[in-house]
C-alpha cells in the first residue's frame, strides 16, 4: 500500500531496478497521498536506478460490478496522474507501464474475480515482461 515505512526501508536496498506493482490494494486517495513520497525516497537514495510503475489491472469482477470498476478506474487515474506529476518535477529514470487487460477479459484469468490464477499471471508476464526488459536493457540489465 506504499506506506512511508516501506519507502524508508527500500532506501537501504541495493537493487538494479525498482518495480512498483502495488496498485491493487491502496485506495485512489492513498495512491495520491503516498506515491510521491515512495518514488522521491527511492530516487533520493538510488539516483540513476530505473523505477518502473505498473498501473493496476481491471479486476475481472469489475466488468460486472460497477463499484469495483469505478474503484479500479480511479486507482489507475490516480497512479497515472502521480506519474505525470513526478515527470513534471523532473524525476529521471521513471517509467509507467499501462494496463491493457493484463489478466484478460474472458473471466479465466482469476480465481475469484480479483486475484490472478496461473493463467492470469501468465498473461501478466506476456504483457509486462517485454516492456520491462526494454527498459532494463537501456541500463545494461539482462
Residue ranges of model-derived segments:
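Substrate-gating cap/lid alpha-helix
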Residues: 61-98, 123, 142
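Histidine-centered active-site loop/cap adjacent to the catalytic His
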Residues: 112-142
Amino acid at each position: 500500500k506504499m506506506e512511508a515505512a516501506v519507502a524508508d526501508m527500500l532506501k537501504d536496498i541495493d537493487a538494479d531496478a525498482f518495480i512498483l506493482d502495488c496498485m491493487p490494494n491502496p485506495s485512489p486517495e492513498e495512491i495520491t497521498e503516498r506515491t510521491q513520497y515512495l518514488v522521491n525516497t527511492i530516487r533520493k537514495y538510488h539516483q540513476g536506478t530505473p523505477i518502473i510503475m505498473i498501473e493496476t489491472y481491471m479486476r475481472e469482477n469489475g466488468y460486472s460490478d460497477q463499484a469495483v470498476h469505478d474503484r479500479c478506474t480511479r486507482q489507475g487515474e490516480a497512479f497515472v496522474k502521480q506519474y505525470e506529476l513526478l515527470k513534471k518535477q523532473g524525476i529521471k529514470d521513471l517509467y509507467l507501464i499501462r494496463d491493457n487487460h493484463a489478466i484478460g477479459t474472458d473471466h479465466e484469468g482469476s480465481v475469484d474475480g480479483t486475484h490472478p490464477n496461473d493463467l492470469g499471471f501468465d498473461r501478466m508476464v506476456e504483457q509486462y515482461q517485454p516492456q520491462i526488459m526494454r527498459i532494463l536493457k537501456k541500463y545494461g540489465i539482462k
